[in-house]
Structures are given as C-alpha cells and as structure tokens.
Amino acid sequence: MTARIVSTFGVAGLLRLKSFSGEYAHLATLKQVCLAPPRSRSSGTLACALPREAVHMVEHVLLRAQDALLKLHRVDTVECARTFVGAELRVPRAEACPLSAGEFYLADLCRCELVFEGSAVGVVLSVVEGGGSSLLEVQRTHGGVCYVPFHRTFIGDVDVGRKKIELLQRWILE
C-alpha cells in the first residue's frame, strides 16, 4: 500500500491521495496503479465502493504541499470519482517511496512472527491505522485476534528480513 484515496477534489474526477509514508514525489511518475478496497476489517470509517482490486491507467498526478491529486483515465466526474474514496493505492515495490537505512514498509510487518522472550506468541495479520500509532492485528498462537499498538512501549526490535518482531509487554495480548 502506498496511499489511500481520502476524497474527491473538484468536479472533473480528481482524487485526493494521502500517502502512508508522508512522501509524495514517487507518485508523480506513476503510469498505472492498482486500486483495491481496504484490506483490513478495521481500516477506518471510509466506505469504499470498489468491489474488487483492479488496475487503472493514470492520466496525471499533481503534487501539493500535504497531499497529491490523482487523475485516472475515464474517471471524469465527481460521481464516478466517489466510488474510489477509501480505496488503497498499490504500486510495485520498485515504484514505492525509497527507504532509508533501517526503515521498512508497514506491509513488510504482515506475516511477521511476534516474539516475547524468545517464544512465538502470534503472527501479524495486518497493520491498521490507529489514533496515536498504527496497530498490529495479531493472530495469537493460542487462538484469537488482538491489536497491539506499534509503539516503542510494546514493540522492540523489528527484523523484517527474519520476519520477527519483538514484543516487550506480554499482557497487551490478553
């Protein structure tokens, strides 16, 4: 996931994007994008009308100070554009925002093993937007799903290469 369509803009079918990384420059050269309904059941209050994931051709992207405007081919009215609000914009990793040393994409946390004091206690299913921090949706080893704030109070070392995330406070799984 690179961005989310948060609203329409104007009457000509423009879509306002909010980048998950906060970076927008890499969006300017996109020729096509994959748009999909939000992955997680808990991805916020935006209701996306897209029935399934699909590839769309990009006419242009206008970068602004705090967001970007996306114009898709054949999306020429605000009514048509509204069906995309809430959708997630996905691009090939090569076209995503470049990472600095020690950084990772939130999507890389999915399927990582959550480990407490050397023992596996769960697997990350998805990353959900939360108020103060993102939340890891975790399938607990002994059953059930819970949410763990992705915050230094609860999360220690993250090794996406080994697919391991250190949990610092076990009680948060209860």
Curated annotation (Swiss-Prot):
Gene3D superfamilies: PRC-barrel domain, RimM. Its main location: cytoplasm. GO terms for molecular function: ribosome binding. Disulfide bonds: none annotated. InterPro entries: PRC_barrel-like_sf, PRC_RimM, RimM, RimM_N, RimM_N_sf, Transl_B-barrel_sf. It holds the Pfam family RimM. One of its GO terms (biological process) is rRNA processing. It is found in: Cytoplasm. The PRC barrel domain binds ribosomal protein uS19. Belongs to the RimM family. An accessory protein needed during the final step in the assembly of 30S ribosomal subunit, possibly for assembly of the head region. Essential for efficient processing of 16S rRNA. May be needed both before and after RbfA during the maturation of 16S rRNA. It has affinity for free ribosomal 30S subunits but not for 70S ribosomes. This is Ribosome maturation factor RimM. It comes from Treponema pallidum (strain Nichols).
